[in-house]
Amino acid sequence: MITRIWHGYTTLENADAYENLLKTEVFPSIEKKNVKGYRKISLLKRVMESEVEFITIMLFDDIQSVKQFVGEDYEQSYVPARAREILSHYDDRAQHYEIISEINY
């Protein structure tokens, strides 16, 4: 299993709008791609003094599944145009990690 981790940042004022955009447009559009091996996406949020950090963690079966999602240059970020309008800055590249162990309690 592969995790794909990406960071994006908004102003304090734009945080709610960005969160709503992710939940109502971006995440559903990813699901509609029907990427084989795409398992789930998690959204994390951290409010800081002058901005809000959002982290997405996507779970895929393998790197081939990630490539089906974003192309051969699989580390490129996936940031739709509407999201770019709201974000103040974001990672140009996503990080990918192989899950080597997982413990559930």
How should each PLM-predicted stretch be described?
Residues 1-5, 14-21, 55-59, 92:
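A broad, low-specificity signal for short, low-complexity segments enriched in glycine/proline
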Residues 3-9, 42-74:
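Short, well-ordered beta-strand segments in beta-rich or mixed alpha/beta enzyme
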Residues 12, 60-62, 98-101:
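Non-catalytic surface loops within mature trypsin-like serine protease
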Residues 14-40, 78-82:
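Short amphipathic alpha-helical segments
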Residues 15-17, 65-67, 103:
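Intrinsically disordered, low-complexity acidic/polar segments
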Residues 28, 32, 72, 88-89:
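A structural signal for alpha-helix termini and helix-coil/disorder junctions
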Residues 39-52, 78-105:
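Glycine-rich beta-strand-turn "strand-cap" elements at beta-sheet edges
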